[in-house]
Amino acid sequence: MEEFQVYLELNRSRRHDFLYPLIFREYIYALAHEHGLNKSMIFFENQGYGNKFSSPIVKRLILRMDQQNRLISSANDSNQNPVFGHNNNLYSQMIAAGFAVIVEIPFSLRLISYSQGAEAAKSHNFQSIHSIFPFLEDKFSHLNYVLEALIPHPIHLEILVQALRYWVKDACSLHLLRFSLYEYCNLKSFITPKKSISIFNPRLFLFLYNSHTCEYESIFLFLRNQSSHLRSTSSGVFLERIFFYGKIKYLGEVFYNDFQNNLWLFKDPFIHFIRYQGKSILASKDTSLLINKWKYYFVDLWQYYFYLWSQSGRVRINQLSKYSLDFLGYLSSVRLNPSVVRSQMLENSFLIDNAVKTLDTRIPIISLIGSLSKAKFCNTLGHPISKPTWADSPDSDIIDRFVRISRNLSHYHSGSSKKKSLYRIKYILRFSCVKTLARKHKSTVRAFLKKLGSEFLEEFFTETEEEHVFSLIFPRGFFALRKVYRGRIWYLDIICINALVNHS
């Protein structure tokens, strides 16, 4: 229990006070408007108040907040209160945008200090989505089970404020945040991300959710470290039996008042944890009994510490050899590659069967075709159709749009073990482009291709920059070059998941 408290205090030692006065500084709102600290915010676009963001409005808002001594809502008129007046929607968005910038400043400074010096290049590479897959290639082939858990959303807004309270001691800022949440956020729409983004500032919403998740992960990391600080002894079978009784005394018991149960943690150095959006993934070399214990650890952690109701059905356990993990636009699984080795010893020969475990990454072709169908590039069966909304654009713009989408998908799915599915996606986009151009010129596809020839669509099949570099190093007919073309390539410049993949 004492170690647990010390661990949390060390993680929260870098607290920053007195953030509230920054709300009355005009340059904070200028930063929010100009996205000065928003370069990494690539999933959402702040809309709805950009054209209303002017210096006089900010000054009136600051003066009105400065003159007001306390935040009191009018019980008679919910649309007008003594703090924000008539334009409460505009003012609330401005305060939310400014508060998002303010609370991000301490964390941004820590990120900048971490990424300086020799760690700059590594930190840049770690920001890539593809950086996780080389790690999976090295680790997943040695693991047995994978546990997928859906992180429950907070059922009450106060949970988000309490999570931020551990990091920010400024009570005034927290009171202002609490007031804004309760005054301008509908509880049901706030829980649903798609609706809440249109009402509340998406940047602040994402920050609050990440701070809540960070608090949960910090506790889980403590439990994981407690369960794996004792490494297995590298020795023979009989020596392991000797050391076994010495290991028993190190099996620790972690107890916390809110859990109501004692958590017995077994030592396992082969636990790997990944969080992707609202899903936690835990891969382990444990037996089915121990991985089931981790399943109930998740449920107890959410229920008794964070007061989040989570059913055990939201946590799934699967065996890696029989299951494909849907993760970041890939279906990842462990595949056995059998190989037969012939050994000759004097006059006797032997056949040795050897199976090697490798990570198999495939494209989820069905879901990707479904995304292309929603975007009106093909029908539900994968047959290309024209894009009528683009038919009014110039031919060069139409071709450029299709080529850009095709190259982005090829770039993102370059790590696929099988390229056949990728070629099918490129085929759909190519003939969707042809049908769109034929529709624009009021012609059939056959007549259009016969008139202009198929050479004008060569951009779909031109070499990528990487293939061009390989062609300069190796001869065109060299076997190693063909092997490189078929191999997996992971890029460390991909920091955003493709829109078509994300909506699949």
UniProtKB/Swiss-Prot annotation:
InterPro entries assigned: Domain_X (IPR024937), Maturase_MatK (IPR002866), Maturase_MatK_N (IPR024942)
Protein name per the record: Maturase K
GO biological process, one term: RNA splicing
Localization terms from the record: Plastid, Chloroplast
Chief location category: plastid
UniProt xrefs under Pfam families: Intron_maturas2 (PF01348), MatK_N (PF01824)
Any one GO cellular component localisation term in the record: chloroplast
Keywords: Chloroplast, mRNA processing, Plastid, RNA-binding, tRNA processing
Stated family: Belongs to the intron maturase 2 family. MatK subfamily.
Keyword RNA-binding on entry: yes
Lineage: Eukaryota, Viridiplantae, Streptophyta, Embryophyta, Tracheophyta
Domain of life: Eukaryota
Gene of this entry: matK
Described purpose of this protein according to its UniProt entry: Usually encoded in the trnK tRNA gene intron. Probably assists in splicing its own and other chloroplast group II introns.
